[in-house]
């Protein structure tokens, strides 16, 4: 089992970053940390998408990683996509320092995120509470600013 993974985020604009993942036990939580720069100040949706395909930019990554066919939600919700990591918060300089621990994603097994795409979005994720159909699919997080395929790390 891989215990570490990394993702280099890039987009068409100024947004870029490096996100690290570490899972010490196969059924334990995954620590997610790193930094994203070039964002507007505020909240930005942060999700693992189904495919590791960036051939047409971030759009070819498909929908959120959702092997259990659930509705979109927040990272602490029972009803959520596996890939729903909530929001990252950018400061006035456009930098989001990421520090998350998640017990639904994994670096092995059915919820493995390796080979899938991590995406940072234009807007805040409403965590499935926006009151419309799009909220239950995407959290109304808007366009995909930057993305990268999650790969095994040393």
Curated annotation (Swiss-Prot):
* Residue positions binding Cu cation: 47, 49, 64, 121
Please give the sites of covalent lipid attachment annotated as S-palmitoyl cysteine: 7
Q: Could you tell me which cysteines form disulfide bridges?
A: 58-147
Effect recorded for residue 17 to S:
In ALS1; sporadic young onset
Q: So what does this thing catalyse?
A: 2 superoxide + 2 H(+) = H2O2 + O2
Pfam families listed in its UniProt record: Sod_Cu
| PTM annotation (N6-succinyllysine): residues | 4, 10, 92, 123, 137
Please give the residue positions where the record annotates the modification N-acetylalanine: 2
- Give EC number(s), comma-separated: 1.15.1.1
According to the record, mutating residue 91 to A results in: In ALS1; does not seem to be linked with a decrease in activity
Is Cell wall biogenesis/degradation a UniProt keyword of this protein? no
Matches recorded under CDD domains: Cu-Zn_Superoxide_Dismutase
Q: Gene Ontology terms, cellular component aspect?
A: axon cytoplasm; cytoplasm; cytoplasmic vesicle; cytosol; dendrite cytoplasm; dense core granule; extracellular exosome; extracellular region
| Protein task | Destroys radicals which are normally produced within the cells and which are toxic to biological systems.
Record protein name field: Superoxide dismutase [Cu-Zn]
Q: Which organism is it from?
A: Homo sapiens (Human)
